[in-house]
Amino acid sequence: MNIKPLNDRVAVKYLEEEEKTRSGIVLPDTAKEEKPQQGEIVAVGKGCTPEDGDPEVKVGDLVVFDKYSGTKVTIDGEDYIILNLEDVLAVIEK
């Protein structure tokens, strides 16, 4: 993948959706039509690094983002979303 977000934007790859819940319930296709709200940051624009040099997000971070934000793009058959940094709501720490 070769994408370079500009300014304060990040490129996020959608996480694969689960086929069934943790309790074993198989999800129908209609339930999977909902837009995912989690993904992995694959590229970060230069405007995402503050002057003190400590970025809030970096490549490889798993993030939660606003449901109706960003621009969806498909590159080499993979779905990504380009988000403004302010639309990233949280970093998922393991």
From Swiss-Prot:
GO biological process per UniProt: chaperone cofactor-dependent protein refolding
Signal peptide: none
UniProt cross-references to CDD domains, sorted A to Z: cpn10
Cellular component annotations (GO), alphabetically ordered: cytoplasm
Keyword Chaperone attributed: yes
Predominant location category: cytoplasm
A GO molecular function held by the record: ATP binding
Keywords: Chaperone, Cytoplasm
Compartments, as annotated in UniProt: Cytoplasm
Family as reported in the entry's similarity comment: Belongs to the GroES chaperonin family.
Function per UniProt: Together with the chaperonin GroEL, plays an essential role in assisting protein folding. The GroEL-GroES system forms a nano-cage that allows encapsulation of the non-native substrate proteins and provides a physical environment optimized to promote and accelerate protein folding. GroES binds to the apical surface of the GroEL ring, thereby capping the opening of the GroEL channel.
Quaternary structure, from the entry: Heptamer of 7 subunits arranged in a ring. Interacts with the chaperonin GroEL.
HAMAP family noted in UniProt: CH10
Name under which the protein is recorded: Co-chaperonin GroES
Species assigned in the record: Halothermothrix orenii (strain H 168 / OCM 544 / DSM 9562)
Gene: groES
